[in-house]
């Protein structure tokens, strides 16, 4: 027997295992089998232990059951999709399809399984499409199948469409865990596919159920598409709900993606919001005549219909119109043309009505009123009539159609709309008028509030002004009282100007006060006198003992006043041409009887001048007022210094009677008596004496001032400069002549003063020194000295000079022991030689000490 024929016979009689066979050799076989194949009844062969062949055998004839089972017709996919049972012919003569499919299957043996359902579900489908044990190994590591790679899009969490991306990228992201089953994905229509998911968003979970692959659905989808395009039998397991999917003809299309669509594609597009394109027909006139129809707008009188009636009427018309007018889609092309024209006219009408509604708001802003609206409507009316006339002509030319009742219903609808718009227009006008009134009322209220606020502000300003004026008046009154207190001592001398002789004032002190100031002072003095006379009970600040002492001091001063022998006039302005020589020694060595007789003569001479009791009482009252004011304003020292320099009528009379005598007699008795009885003023104020006060009282020397007395002598004159006299004279003994040493110390002090004084041009140092030496030597006169220096010098340091001046003056006055005053010392000559010393008669003539 030929061995080749025996081998062919063995291969032909191989027992083929069906799908339910338990043979181990065929359990993992991928060779397609058929359940309806006839099983051969023969004993087992050696081929049963080897296994089934895995490559097509060239010895198998075309009429074999294997080839018939392996060959699937091209329309198997379509038959399965439509739900019809798959009919596979047993004798199929197309071996090329089987060879191509088997070779393709063996090339992609490691690719993932398409479906995971068991083959028992689909008994008529080849079992190589299913894998009961799960997906094939290494399914995620294989590249996508060659030939076709799908393009996918997806919607991200923000609602944005991302993509398109290839199958490889989508597979990697899916395996990386970036995609969830609820992700919306869409496959672009690059090629036909059997599931009908092109250009449609589905969830990723739906795709996995379609391809029955949960590990890599994208690659599995591409495998299924390739099988379908290569005419490989492929059955997609579909559920009972999706078995009636419309089948599509599988037409090979080039893998070219473009955003340009054809007309048919545009009509088939559907967007996410459900919109789509559809065909419409629009009538375009050929003759070029453009006719627009405008509905007739009724007059204003027709607009007064209530809103309820118009709304009900419009509802009726719209309901009737809906019943009569067919839908736009069901209408014929001619009717669609009519509808398009009506749509244009309605849009024109609504635009015009909107413009009419908008006009009143602009007119309201421009505040032109409702009259202009009426004018606008009157202007629009002829245009509407012309349009209606043209419309009638055009309708007469056109043939009558069946849609005349529809046109009438449209007109009714337009009239209803016009009435509604008119009603809205009126309501808008009323609302705007109400807003106008409300705004005007608000403006009036705001204006009233502003006026009230302005009035309040003005009232507050007036109150403030009144308060300020009251304060200023009070300050002026205080200043007047202060001026009165400082100027009380000036009135007696001004009243007795007729009897006194005018003195020659210094050039810097020769300032005439204005008459208005004197008038104010005199009027204020009169008011004070009236008030003092009207007051019956007063509260004295001092005890009765102080009053008695003050009266005693005044009497003693009046009794101890002597006749001055100095020349009349002030020594401030002119320096004496001839030196004054005083025989101090002879005067000191006089007998006490002579001094007593001299005092008696003075008393006899002054006997005629007696103090008046009424004047003394007035002085007491004024003294009490002055003490009150000094405690409040702290002006005691300034008043004392001022009063001490005021001349009295008696002293002026004595000066007039002794103008020719140029010698001065120094009385030791009077000086000692004053020093013993006069109290020391301990509380001297530091207030500043004005220059006007100093100028008005700077006409007489201090020696003359201390000896003047009269009925009109001012208050406190007995206590002027008490410390100077107390320090100069010791009451315990009669002073003896100190010699030239005491006088030389005075001259040294004056020389130092002259060297330090750097005054302005025209100011004599002696005049300034005389004024400064008339002040008390204590620290209370420091500021007065400093102010005086500042007023007469632009280069000196007034405060420093004041401290040095007071210090040196106190040192000088502690060492000197003579009855001379500083004014007398200033009147002495000065020079480089010692001729300024006092000439005393001695043993040898011409000898100078």
UniProtKB/Swiss-Prot annotation:
Q: Name one Pfam family in it.
A: GYF
Alphabetized PROSITE patterns for the sequence: GYF (PS50829)
Q: Where is the composition biased (Low complexity)?
A: 308-318, 644-661
PTM sites of type Phosphothreonine? 350
Domain GYF, first and last residues per copy: 149-205
Q: Which residues form a coiled coil?
A: 410-484
The further comment given in this record reads: Present with 830 molecules/cell in log phase SD medium.
Write the protein's name: SMY2 homolog 2
Question: What species is given as this protein's source?
Answer: Saccharomyces cerevisiae (strain ATCC 204508 / S288c)
């Amino acid at each position: 027997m030929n061995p080749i024929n025996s081998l062919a016979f063995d291969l032909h009689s191989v027992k083929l295992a069906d799908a339910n066979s338990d043979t181990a050799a065929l359990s993992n076989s991928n060779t397609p089998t058929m359940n309806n194949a006839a099983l051969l009844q023969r004993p087992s062969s050696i081929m049963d232990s080897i296994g089934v062949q895995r490559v097509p055998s060239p010895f198998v004839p075309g009429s074999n059951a294997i080839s018939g089972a392996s060959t699937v017709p091209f329309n198997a996919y379509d038959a399965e999709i439509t739900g019809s049972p798959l009919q596979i012919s047993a004798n199929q003569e197309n071996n090329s399809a089987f060879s191509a499919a088997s070779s393709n299957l063996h090339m992609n043996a490691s690719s993932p399984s398409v479906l995971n359902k068991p083959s028992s579900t689909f008994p008529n489908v080849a079992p190589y499409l299913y894998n009961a044990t799960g997906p094939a190994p290494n399914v995620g590591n294989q590249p996508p199948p060659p030939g076709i790679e799908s393009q996918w899009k997806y919607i991200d969490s923000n609602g944005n469409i991302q993509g398109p991306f290839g199958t490889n990228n989508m597979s990697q992201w899916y395996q990386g865990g970036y995609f969830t089953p609820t992700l919306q994905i869409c496959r672009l229509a690059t090629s036909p596919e059997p599931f009908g998911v092109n250009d449609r968003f589905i969830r990723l979970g739906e795709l996995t159920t379609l391809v029955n692959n949960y590990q890599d659905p994208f690659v599995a989808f591409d495998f299924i598409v390739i099988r379908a395009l290569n005419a490989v039998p492929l059955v997609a397991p579909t559920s009972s709900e999706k078995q009636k999917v419309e089948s599509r003809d599988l037409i090979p299309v080039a893998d070219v993606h473009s955003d340009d669509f054809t007309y048919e594609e545009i009509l088939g597009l559907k967007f996410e919001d459900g919109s789509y394109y559809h065909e419409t027909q629009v009538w375009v006139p050929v003759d070029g005549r453009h006719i627009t129809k405008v509905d007739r707008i009724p007059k204003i009188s027709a607009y007064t219909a209530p809103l309820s009636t118009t709304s009900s009427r419009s509802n009726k018309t719209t309901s009737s119109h809906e019943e009569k007018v067919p839908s736009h889609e069901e209408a014929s092309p001619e009717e669609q043309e009519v509808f398009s024209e009506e749509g244009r006219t309605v849009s024109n009408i609504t635009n015009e009505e909107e413009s009419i509604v908008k006009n009143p708001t602009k007119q309201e802003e421009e505040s032109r009123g409702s009259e202009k609206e009426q004018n606008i409507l009157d202007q629009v009316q002829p245009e509407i009539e012309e349009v209606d006339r043209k419309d009638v002509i055009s309708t007469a030319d056109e043939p009558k159609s069946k849609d005349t009742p529809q046109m009438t219903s449209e007109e009714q609808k337009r009239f209803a709309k016009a009435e509604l718009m008119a009603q809205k227009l009126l309501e808008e006008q009323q609302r705007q008028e109400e807003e106008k009134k409300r705004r005007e009322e608000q403006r009036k209220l705001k204006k009233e509030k502003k006026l009230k606020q302005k009035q309040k502000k003005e009232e507050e300003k007036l109150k403030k002004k009144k308060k300020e004026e009251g304060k200023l008046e009070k300050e002026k009154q205080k200043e007047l009282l202060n001026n009165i207190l400082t100027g009380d001592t000036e009135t007696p001398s001004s009243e007795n100007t007729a009897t006194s002789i005018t003195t020659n004032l210094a050039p810097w002190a020769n300032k005439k006060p204005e008459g208005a100031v004197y008038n104010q002072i005199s009027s204020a003095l009169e008011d004070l006198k009236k008030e003092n006379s009207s007051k019956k009970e007063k509260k004295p600040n001092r005890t009765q003992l102080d009053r008695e002492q003050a009266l005693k001091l005044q009497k003693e001063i009046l009794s101890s006043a002597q006749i001055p022998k100095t020349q009349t006039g002030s020594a401030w302005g002119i320096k004496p041409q001839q030196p004054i020589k005083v025989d101090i020694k002879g005067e000191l060595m006089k007998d006490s009887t002579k001094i007593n007789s001299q005092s008696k003569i003075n008393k006899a001479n002054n006997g005629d001048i007696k103090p008046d009791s009424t004047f003394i009482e007035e002085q007491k009252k004024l003294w009490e007022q002055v003490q009150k004011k000094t405690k409040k304003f702290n002006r005691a020292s300034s008043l004392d210094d001022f009063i001490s320099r005021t001349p009295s009528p008696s002293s002026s009379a004595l000066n007039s009677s002794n103008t020719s005598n140029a010698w001065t007699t120094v009385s030791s008795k009077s000086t000692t008596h004053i020093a013993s009885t006069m109290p020391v003023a301990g509380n001297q104020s530091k207030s500043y004496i004005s220059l006007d006060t100093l100028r008005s009282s700077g006409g007489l020397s201090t020696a003359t001032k201390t000896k003047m007395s009269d009925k009109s002598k001012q208050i406190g004159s007995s206590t002027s400069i008490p410390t100077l006299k107390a320090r100069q004279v010791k009451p315990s003994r009669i002073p003896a002549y100190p010699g030239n040493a005491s006088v030389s110390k005075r001259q040294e002090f004056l020389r130092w003063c002259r060297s330090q004084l750097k005054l302005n041009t025209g100011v004599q140092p002696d005049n300034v020194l005389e004024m400064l030496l008339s002040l008390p030597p204590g620290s209370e006169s420091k500021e007065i000295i400093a102010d005086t220096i500042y007023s007469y010098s632009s280069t000196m340091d007034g405060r420093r000079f004041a401290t040095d001046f007071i210090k040196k003056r106190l040192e000088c006055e502690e060492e000197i022991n003579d009855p001379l005053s500083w004014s007398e010392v200033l009147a002495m000559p000065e020079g480089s030689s010692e001729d300024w010393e006092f000439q005393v008669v001695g043993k040898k003539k011409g000898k100078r000490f």
